[in-house]
């Protein structure tokens, strides 16, 4: 597996998560995680495993249009089966007066290859104040 293959797979996992999250597709969000995957976000605590992830993300389906804009993804470590990446994220929410920034933060991701796709083993969000 080449560096480019890993980068492409990691970016695809990040995009799949983001699109599913913004569209409110809970099962598709959960599918981006390994079965024992962990999500850590302020206000959510530590969620481990598909059942805990599904229960939490089902409560956070969007009630109005939203977008998580992810940029500057950098692969920091990788092997053929594991990878670490960091990305910046801006969370936008549409209100009656248009779109507004709700949060700026950084994802710190550990991913594991599952066949041809990459899954989150751990996804941590740190807001930037």
Predicted regions located by residue number:
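Short, low-complexity N-terminal intrinsically disordered segments enriched in polar/charged residues
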Residues: 1-27, 31-35
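Rossmann-fold NAD(P)H-dependent dehydrogenase/reductase core
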Residues: 9, 48, 52, 56, ...
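A solvent-exposed, acidic/Ser-Thr-rich amphipathic alpha-helical stretch
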Residues: 26-90
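Short, surface-exposed coil-to-beta transition loops
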Residues: 68-70, 102-107
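Beta-strand elements of well-folded, non-transmembrane domains
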Residues: 89-95, 127
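Short, solvent-exposed loop/turn segments at secondary-structure boundaries
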Residues: 96-100
């Amino acid at each position: 597996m080449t560096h480019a293959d890993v980068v492409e797979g990691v970016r695809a996992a990040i995009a799949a998560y983001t699109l599913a999250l913004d569209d409110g597709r809970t099962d598709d969000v959960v599918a981006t995680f390994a079965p024992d995957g962990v999500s850590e976000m302020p206000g959510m605590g530590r969620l481990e495993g598909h059942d805990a992830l599904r229960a939490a993300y089902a409560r956070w389906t969007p009630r109005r249009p939203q977008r998580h804009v992810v940029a500057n993804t950098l692969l920091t470590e990788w092997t053929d089966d594991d990878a670490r990446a960091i990305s910046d994220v801006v969370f936008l929410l549409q209100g009656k007066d248009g779109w507004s920034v709700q949060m700026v933060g950084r994802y710190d991701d550990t991913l594991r290859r599952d066949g041809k796709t990459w899954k989150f083993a751990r996804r941590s969000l740190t807001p930037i104040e």
